[in-house]
């Protein structure tokens, strides 16, 4: 949901475990 994973997902996916792409950033549920 809210916390940002410190990662962008312009490629469409996030490398950080537990993070999902909320374009253009990765967020943690």
UniProtKB/Swiss-Prot annotation:
Q: Which Pfam families match?
A: Cyclotide (PF03784)
Write down the superkingdom of origin.
Answer: Eukaryota
Q: Which PROSITE patterns match?
A: CYCLOTIDE
**Carries keyword Disulfide bond?**
yes
Keywords per UniProt:
Disulfide bond, Knottin, Plant defense
InterPro entries tied to this protein: Cyclotide, Cyclotide_sf
Q: Which GO terms describe its biological process?
A: defense response
Post-translational modifications? This is a cyclic peptide.
Q: List the disulfide bonds.
A: 5-19, 9-21, 14-26
The record places the cross-link (Cyclopeptide (Gly-Asn)) at 1-29
Name the job this protein performs: Probably participates in a plant defense mechanism. Has moderate levels of cytotoxic activity, active against a human lymphoma cell line with an IC(50) of >30 uM.
Q: Record's family?
A: Belongs to the cyclotide family. Moebius subfamily.
Record remark: domains: The presence of a 'disulfide through disulfide knot' structurally defines this protein as a knottin.
Q: State what protein this is by name.
A: Cyclotide vibi-D
């Amino acid at each position: 949901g809210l916390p940002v994973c410190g990662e962008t997902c312009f490629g469409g996916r996030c490398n950080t475990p537990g993070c999902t792409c909320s374009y253009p950033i990765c967020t943690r549920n």
